[in-house]
């Protein structure tokens, strides 16, 4: 299956050659990849000009984005705002061969809520328009993980927590990430173990596997950099992700060896087909969210 071959090449980081005369195969690949988050990664490996011409976001654009984000981080540090970058930005910046390999649309930045005064001072000093949403955090219906979403050269999503709940704004995963972080290529990021946990949490619990196969590649890249298995095991257990991690590792290893089971093959194809799609049947969580918004609408 084409989806299996695409994902295997990306995981193995192998160049991909296609017969320039094989128009049907080229069309099939570009059709599959056109909305996929791993499209640039595959296209950067591809030797076919016909396929490479379909890559809308190239290396230079991501290099510029990363320079801008590093400048934002520097200014946050100058204001002594504790922060770490999560999700796409650190992965693009430090875990992939080319920055453009890992597509992201927003820069997700987790900040320490204890520094909220200094954070808003940073926003005002840099003329970044905001709504001072901090004043809404105690509202019953306020369930968003992002404190401020600011449209600049790169969309900046400033988060106060990683996991979402209808209770308080407390988040153990966020506390771990702000406490156990390192600096990679000039950006503060959670430890590899926490970054992997966040990746798995978002894929399974937040996105319900609708984010596609990118979480498999992210996980493989993080693990390749090195993780402390004992520490990782403890964190995964805390967030009920142990079994999902084991299944993910098994899937990646089998796929790289070319011994994936039929069940795994069907699962991967499903990831490709369902990326970005919404379920017709809303989850209990989505229903509860909508009810909460009716009773106490978000203030913006």
Regions found by a protein language model. Give the residues of each.
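Conserved NTP-donor binding/palm subdomain of two-metal-ion nucleotidyltransferases/polymerases, i.e.
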Residues: 1-105, 111-300
